Amino acid sequence: MSFGGHTPRKRFGQHWLRDERVLDRILDASDLGDDDRVLEVGPGRGALTERLLASSAAAVHAVELDRDLVAGLQDRFGDSPRFSLREGDVLAVPLTLPDGQRATKVVANIPYNITGPLLERLIGRLDQPVDPPYQRLVLLVQKEVAERIRARPGASSFSALSVRMQLLAKCSSVCPVPPRCFQPPPKVHSEVIRLDPLPLEQRPDPVICRRVERLLKQAFLARRKMLRNTLTVSQPLSELETITQQAGIDLRQRPQEVAPHAWVELARGLNQADSAASSL
């Protein structure tokens, strides 16, 4: 097995995790069983891949963009019948295993520059979630992104991303990851997060979700303003006040103070009001 003199490439956002304790925490959070098929994004030199293959997981399928690393990974793990490797961009290549089966869990050290698009590919959008959802995703992301994903209403980091992710999955922190845990050290702190996607039947109806998306774009465009001044709807103010009260929302609130489920109730109330008005 040889990776030659390969050094991390900035254009690929490569920062290789080398801290043994963090690698163990990722594996523990994945909670792999013998019926799990794991999709690993960005295996690098295979530090985590080695642990995944040492677990009881039925299969480990890695996706690596850097051609220079692919040969080394194949040399190192290619003899294992439980290991498969695809060279390519994780945003573009098929994510199924070679036998056509789908992974049950995802473990990823996400390059910071593709966090948003990759989250959308792995979990989906509010109005178009991944179906069926993965059972669990354990992701290493920039700390700022992790804080936004798991933020609670009222926190300064609570954002439209917080609402979207929390309506799609249960989000929790696994552990902080300081720069010294990587080679080379990034300029920012990182965090391992765990996402357990909600079953489709526990997610809001896609029609409601489309309305939620419109509301979030309106409100968070001016996040410091009260909702009274940012929401653009067809209903008169008196009717809007009734709808927001029923959703548990005060129009004097700012968007970062409104819980995810309240956005859903607001969207549902507005859609019902629109339907009632159109039937007159």
From Swiss-Prot:
UniProt-listed Gene3D superfamilies: Ribosomal RNA adenine dimethylase-like, domain 2, Vaccinia Virus protein VP39
According to its UniProt record, where is this protein located?
Cytoplasm
- Asked whether the UniProt record includes Lipid biosynthesis among its keywords, one would answer no
Q: Which PROSITE patterns match?
A: RRNA_A_DIMETH, SAM_RNA_A_N6_MT
InterPro entries attached to this UniProt entry: KsgA/Erm, rRNA_Ade_diMease-like_C, rRNA_Ade_Mease_Trfase_CS, rRNA_Ade_methylase_Trfase_N, rRNA_adenine_dimethylase, SAM-dependent_MTases_sf
Keywords from the named record: Cytoplasm, Methyltransferase, RNA-binding, rRNA processing, S-adenosyl-L-methionine, Transferase
| SMART domains reported in the protein's UniProt record | rADc
The EC number on file is 2.1.1.182
One GO MF annotation is: RNA binding
Q: Which residues bind S-adenosyl-L-methionine?
A: H15, L17, G42, E64, D89, N109
Q: Which Pfam families match?
A: RrnaAD
GO CC, alphabetical: cytosol
Per its record, the protein catalyses: adenosine(1518)/adenosine(1519) in 16S rRNA + 4 S-adenosyl-L-methionine = N(6)-dimethyladenosine(1518)/N(6)-dimethyladenosine(1519) in 16S rRNA + 4 S-adenosyl-L-homocysteine + 4 H(+)
Query: Out of the domains of life, which is the source?
Result: Bacteria
HAMAP family associated with the record: 16SrRNA_methyltr_A
Which family does the entry's similarity section mention? Belongs to the class I-like SAM-binding methyltransferase superfamily. rRNA adenine N(6)-methyltransferase family. RsmA subfamily.
Describe the task this protein carries out. Specifically dimethylates two adjacent adenosines (A1518 and A1519) in the loop of a conserved hairpin near the 3'-end of 16S rRNA in the 30S particle. May play a critical role in biogenesis of 30S subunits.
Q: What is this protein called?
A: Ribosomal RNA small subunit methyltransferase A
Tell me which species this is from: Synechococcus sp. (strain WH7803)
Taxonomic path? Bacteria, Bacillati, Cyanobacteriota, Cyanophyceae, Synechococcales
Gene (UniProt):
rsmA
